[in-house]
Design a protein with these regions (language model features):
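Conserved protein kinase catalytic/activation segment
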Residues: 1-11
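Regulatory N- and C-terminal appendages and interdomain linkers associated
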Residues: 6-7, 84-131
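Active-site activation/catalytic loop segments of kinase-like enzymes and analogous catalytic loops
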Residues: 8-9, 15-76, 94-109
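General secondary-structure edge motif
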Residues: 13-14, 81
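A structural motif corresponding to the C-terminal end of an alpha-helix
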Residues: 74-85
Length: 131
């Protein structure tokens, strides 16, 4: 929530039950951060993305990226890897993107983007586990 008058910003995430404490698992919060920074969730929800399906059910997608996006993403992943298994974070991130689909049913292009990124993340993790 943003209270512009009092210059106050509060984050509330109704994550449900995740983790063994009332505060949940910190990996979920890290995945939410990666979901935003690397995955481009906010960019997509702000309309800075195009997505379409071609004849062979291929999803074509373009997401606006600031000049330093790749560097920031790489740096965040390095920070994550210092403390957690990046594949576990990517798994949660992929599930976060997939879980957004029903919440954005009024915007098919956005759903395509979320679906595509979610499946990409899950495939990245599954491909690593089969090696």
């Amino acid at each position: 929530f943003c209270d512009f008058k009092n210059k106050n910003f509060k984050l509330i995430d109704p994550r449900g039950k995740w983790g063994s404490t009332m505060f949940g698992d910190l990996k979920y919060d890290v995945a939410k951060l990666r979901h935003s920074v690397v995955g481009g969730f906010d960019t997509i929800t702000n309309g800075l993305c195009t997505a379409s399906i071609s004849e062979g059910n291929h999803i074509a997608m373009k997401i606006f990226e600031p000049k330093n996006h790749q560097e920031v993403s790489k740096y965040l992943d390095e920070l994550i890897q210092n403390q957690w298994n990046l594949n576990e974070i990517k798994l949660i991130e992929g599930l976060l993107f997939i879980s957004m689909l029903p919440l954005h049913k009024d915007h098919f292009e956005r759903q395509l983007a979320f679906y595509s990124i979610g499946i990409q993340r899950l495939n990245e993790v599954l491909d690593k586990t089969s090696e």
